[in-house]
Every structure is written in C-alpha cells, then in structure tokens.
Amino acid sequence: MADPDPRYPRSSIEDDFNYGSSVASATVHIRMAFLRKVYSILSLQVLLTTVTSTVFLYFESVRTFVHESPALILLFALGSLGLIFALILNRHKYPLNLYLLFGFTLLEALTVAVVVTFYDVYIILQAFILTTTVFFGLTVYTLQSKKDFSKFGAGLFALLWILCLSGFLKFFFYSEIMELVLAAAGALLFCGFIIYDTHSLMHKLSPEEYVLAAISLYLDIINLFLHLLRFLEAVNKK
C-alpha cells in the first residue's frame, strides 16, 4: 500500500468525519459545529410543534374536527413511526435525511397538537415551562459533567418497556392514583433519557450524525412534555 503523499496530509476534518470517531474526540471546531446543527434542528422542531399546537388550540373548528376524528391521532402516530425507521436507515443520505426529518417532525407535531386539545391551556403552559426548564438544566449539567452516563442505557430501556407495559395494563385497571404514578414515573424516566442521549451524542455519535442526535432529543422532549401534561392533569383532579 502506497504511503500518502506528504504534500497532501490527511486533515483533522477528514479524521473527524470517519464514522468510527465520536464527537468528543473531534476538534473543538467540529464539536461546536455539530452542537450548533443539533440544537438548531431541535429548536426548529420544537418551534414547529409549538406553532402547530397553538393553531389547534386557537381555532375552535380545528379542535372540533380532531375531536370528531379519533382515527387522526393513530394515523399521525403510525406515519411518524414509519418515518423514524426510514430516517434511522437513511440518516447518512443527504438531503434525503432532511426531507424525512421534516416529514417526521410535522407528523409528530400534528400528533402532539391533537393531544393538547384535550387539556386546559393553563396546564399546557405549565407543562411547557417545566419541560423547557428541565431540558435546559439537564443539558447544561450533562455537557459539563465528567461522569459516564452510558452505563445507564440498559436500565433506562428496561424501565421504558416496563412503563409501556404498565400503560397497556392501565386500560384494564384504571385508577387516578395509577395515572398519577405512571405519569410521574414517565416524566422522571425521560429526564434520564435526556441525560443519556445528551451524553451519547457527544461520546457515541460521529459528527455526521447530527440528524439522529436531534431526533433523539426531540423525542425525549415530547415524551417529557406529554407525561408532565398527564401528571399535572392528574394532580388537578385530586
């Protein structure tokens, strides 16, 4: 194998964009560019979701339509599930990954918008403020922490399966106390996922996988918000 031409040394950028290298091992310039992309995409996703939810809440005709069409939320949820699998498979294919990202975010925003129409505006605002505050605090904590949070991944996913199973059983054994406990447990679980995914985007992903990083954090935010909605609603009923 021929030696590389000394006139054209391999750049650090080439090294950083090898899929085997993590963001944390890249140069400061690459790390900052990666974080800007991730959090810019995430901000746009949250903005689209917020605007869509506001439209659904503001217009009475829209609320009435979605309440009379319960199949809509299932359609949006299944569509977003299909697109997220397509995104994972095509996350390195630009610009296809961005088109899939937009489609996924739009369907997820529509799903959230339908859900919030069943809640009081005051509770929605409380959940939104809490979600924003918690996400910002956990992000700052994780990015400056020297701890290795990757070891918590298996436990978090095991707890997620337990939460999903408990949510299924809730349909057969519903109680207000159970709803309160599951909502609180779900909110705490996704706080854990925010820490885990923030740590993972720096230590497990390559600099080109910013779309995957944004999706992970977006789903964490949405799930935290929805569980806080349920929790606050359950508390207000007590």
From Swiss-Prot:
The record's section on CDD domains has: GAAP_like
Quick one: signal sequence residues? none
TM region positions? 39-59, 69-89, 98-118, 121-141, 152-172, 176-196
GO molecular function annotation: calcium channel activity
Report membrane topology: Multi-pass membrane protein
* One Gene Ontology term from the biological process aspect of the record: locomotory behavior
Give UniProt keywords alphabetically.
Apoptosis, Golgi apparatus, Membrane, Transmembrane, Transmembrane helix
PANTHER family annotated for this entry?
Answer: BAX INHIBITOR-RELATED, PROTEIN LIFEGUARD 4
Q: Which family does it belong to?
A: Belongs to the BI1 family. LFG subfamily.
- What is the name of the protein in this document? Protein lifeguard 4
